[in-house]
Curated annotation (Swiss-Prot):
Protein known as: Tubby-like F-box protein 5
Any matching Pfam family: Tub
Expressing tissues: Ubiquitous.
PANTHER family: TUBBY-LIKE F-BOX PROTEIN 6 (PTHR16517:SF104), TUBBY-RELATED (PTHR16517)
Gene label: TULP5
Residue stretches of biased makeup (Low complexity): 47-65
Annotated stretches, region: Disordered: 17-65
Organism of derivation: Oryza sativa subsp. japonica
Family: Belongs to the TUB family.
Length: 428
């Protein structure tokens, strides 16, 4: 039997597994693309379900999986390795996700075979969006902007395909306008931006002038000190899953330089990545790399005292987990700071220019490249400091490219790029 036949049979079997899982998938907005269990939002939400519900689903799955759940480990490993090696790009890559959805044993083997994004350079599971990109080459993506709905869609690939059928959606964001403020809500799907949804992955909040932005992650980063903020967030939940952490986690701050004289020129920005240590970019350094969804805040940090109906906004420092949440910020490691790569003025074109290596074709104030800004005392090689970690630029009407690499994740890079779309009266 060929590998494609095996995967096809697995998908047919998977579609018939468990009316409970089907009802769970159909009940979630955005998770019903064909109702398949291997869709990203469903896999994300399944890992955040209560233990009792997961146990019931596992028992039901075991009764219906038959011979596939009892394959010899050596054969199972060989099958998944072959599928992983042959299906390297999307949409064929969904076959690897299908293998992880067969049963618990298949999922464990698939998790062993599929390496982190930094190691293999391939985006496979939703957790890949929170992992650092590869070191040797950037992950190339593009962003579509819908002005009518203030929606921004991040896709994997060099540029949009002709009909868009094979474009792999990674993340979606929507600009939410309030009476006194605005924010960007980031989700796994393009039709559900509820803060209480299982597809919610984070948000971006600007200040009034549009000069400072705070990036909040829905999950606490690994290897971080948690420091409660005195001003709790005002997000209210109608119904909160016991597996979801009650908090937004301040993982980065993006600041734009205030332009008093309103002189024309490129925007100047600085990104402080609170959850990434600066030393991670040196040879042998390691950025925090999550390998699975964190099920509950209680598994990582002690409970935080909150006001009724409110949740704490939590800040991080790039150090080991601390039990004393009320103490001062522990700064054993300096956070990574990113800055604009200095452009050059082109006399003939009469504009500021950067070498985007063909990935940006339209001049725009939104175009930028970010490199590391480190203290000389840290001993980071000059070559590492010159590497472009994130670049963003325009290629057409409402279409932009976004290329990122280690140590940024897709979520962090996308959130930084979203700051370019907000109004900045004090910076222009």
């Amino acid at each position: 039997m060929s590998l494609k036949s095996i995967v096809r049979e697995l998908r047919e079997m998977r579609d018939g597994i468990g009316s409970m899982s089907r009802r769970a998938a159909d009940g979630r907005a955005g998770g019903g693309r064909g109702g398949s269990r291997h869709s990203w939002p469903v896999l994300w939400s399944e890992q955040q379900q209560p233990p009792q519900q997961q146990q019931l689903q596992r028992q039901e799955h075991q009764q219906q999986q038959g011979r596939w759940a009892n394959l010899p480990p050596e054969l199972l490993l060989d099958v998944i390795q072959r599928v992983e090696a042959s299906e390297a790009t999307w949409p064929a890559r969904r076959q690897v996700v299908a293998c992880a959805a067969v049963c618990r044993s298949w999922r464990e083997v698939t998790k062993e075979v599929v390496k982190t994004l930094e190691e293999c350079g391939r985006i496979t599971f939703p957790i890949s969006l929170k992992q650092p990109g590869p070191r040797e080459h950037p992950v190339q993506c593009f962003v579509r902007r819908d002005r009518a709905t203030s929606t921004y869609l991040l896709y994997l690939g060099l540029s949009p395909s002709l009909h868009g059928e094979n474009d792999k959606l990674l993340l979606a964001a929507r600009k939410i306008r309030r009476a006194t403020r605005t924010s960007f809500v980031i989700s796994l799907v393009s039709n559900d931006f509820s803060l209480s949804s299982s597809t919610y992955v984070g948000k971006l909040k600007p200040n009034f002038l549009g000069t400072k932005f705070t990036i909040f992650d829905s999950q606490p980063p690994c290897d971080a000190v948690v420091l409660p903020n005195n001003r709790p967030s005002k997000r209210h939940f109608k119904q909160v899953s016991p597996r979801l952490p009650l908090g937004n986690y301040n993982v980065a701050t993006v600041s734009y330089e205030l332009t008093v004289l309103r002189n024309r020129g490129p925007r100047r920005m600085q990104c402080t990545m609170h959850s990434i240590p600066a030393l991670c970019i040196q040879e042998g350094g390691k950025a925090p790399t999550p390998t699975g969804i964190i099920h509950s805040l209680d598994e990582q940090v002690p409970a935080l005292s909150t006001s009724k109906g409110k949740e704490p906004a939590i800040e991080f420092s790039s150090t080991s987990l601390s039990a004393d949440l009320s103490g001062p910020v522990c700064t054993n490691e300096v956070p990574l700071v990113l800055k604009n790569k200095a452009p050059r003025w082109h006399e003939q074109l009469q504009c500021w220019c950067l070498n985007f290596r063909g990935r940006v074709t339209v001049a725009s104030v939104k175009n930028f490249q970010l490199v590391a800004s480190v203290d000389p005392s840290l001993g980071i090689p000059a070559a590492e400091q010159e590497k472009v970690i994130l670049q963003f630029g325009k290629i057409g009407k409402d279409i932009f490219t976004m290329d990122y690499r280690y140590p940024l994740s897709a979520f962090q890079a996308f959130a930084i790029c979203l700051t370019s779309f907000d109004t900045k009266p004090a910076c222009e």
